[in-house]
């Protein structure tokens, strides 16, 4: 679903374990790592999209996770020009995302990347909370930084110091959904 400004509505997913690490996934047949994310279909709620994408990309369902928080507003990023399909209508210039912070409450053996016909990832790893900023494609780095800074106080109970390299002003804070 592309809005009037050219942004595709999307949910982003930060899955954490009991060590406060996050699940980072490797794009199929690429040397590119990212957090799970996916589009919100027409008429679909953010939560419906979250659970659909969680199942399609990671093989998890509602009973495997606990929702901790979400970003309260859309976070946007623009595609580089080479990524924009100018002949496609409507033209999509980027994505606007709402991000959910989840905790895995089941065994990690439930994580299955090949549950659906359109497999997006071929590997995954638990990594340090801030690591996705370093590993994601360059044009997504600012949104990853904003999102992780917004969600960190929830995961770390306001006890975690933001690394110095990410100390630019925060654009939003998280809404706590579950405790």
Curated annotation (Swiss-Prot):
It is an enzyme of class 3 (hydrolase). Residues 6-149 form the Nudix hydrolase domain. Keywords: Hydrolase. The gene is rppH. GO terms for cellular component: cytoplasm. Accelerates the degradation of transcripts by removing pyrophosphate from the 5'-end of triphosphorylated RNA, leading to a more labile monophosphorylated state that can stimulate subsequent ribonuclease cleavage. Coiled coil: none annotated. HAMAP family: Nudix_RppH (MF_00298). Pfam families: NUDIX. PROSITE patterns: NUDIX, NUDIX_BOX. One of its GO terms (biological process) is mRNA catabolic process. One of its GO terms (molecular function) is mRNA 5'-diphosphatase activity. InterPro entries: NUDIX_hydrolase-like_dom_sf, NUDIX_hydrolase_CS, NUDIX_hydrolase_dom, RppH. A motif (Nudix box) lies at residues 38-59. This is RNA pyrophosphohydrolase. Belongs to the Nudix hydrolase family. RppH subfamily. It comes from Ruthia magnifica subsp. Calyptogena magnifica. Its cofactor is a divalent metal cation. NCBIfam families: PRK00714.1-3, PRK00714.1-4, PRK00714.1-5.
């Amino acid at each position: 679903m592309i809005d009037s400004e050219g942004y595709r509505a999307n949910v982003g997913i930060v899955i954490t374990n009991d060590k406060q690490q996050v699940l980072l996934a490797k794009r199929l047949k690429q040397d590119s790592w990212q957090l799970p994310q996916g589009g919100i279909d027409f008429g679909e709620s953010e939560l419906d999209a979250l659970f659909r994408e969680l199942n399609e990309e990671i093989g998890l369902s509602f009973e495997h996770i606990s929702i901790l928080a979400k970003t309260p507003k859309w976070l946007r990023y623009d595609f580089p020009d080479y990524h924009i399909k100018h002949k496609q209508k409507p033209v999509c210039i980027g994505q606007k995302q709402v991000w959910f912070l989840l905790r895995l409450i089941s065994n990690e053996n439930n994580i299955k990347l090949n549950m659906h016909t359109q497999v997006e990832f071929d590997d995954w790893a638990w990594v340090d909370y801030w690591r996705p900023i370093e590993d994601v494609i360059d044009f997504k780095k600012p949104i990853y930084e904003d999102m992780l800074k917004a969600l960190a106080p929830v995961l770390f109970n306001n006890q975690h110091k933001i690394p110095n390299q990410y100390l630019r002003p925060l654009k939003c804070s998280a809404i706590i959904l579950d405790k």
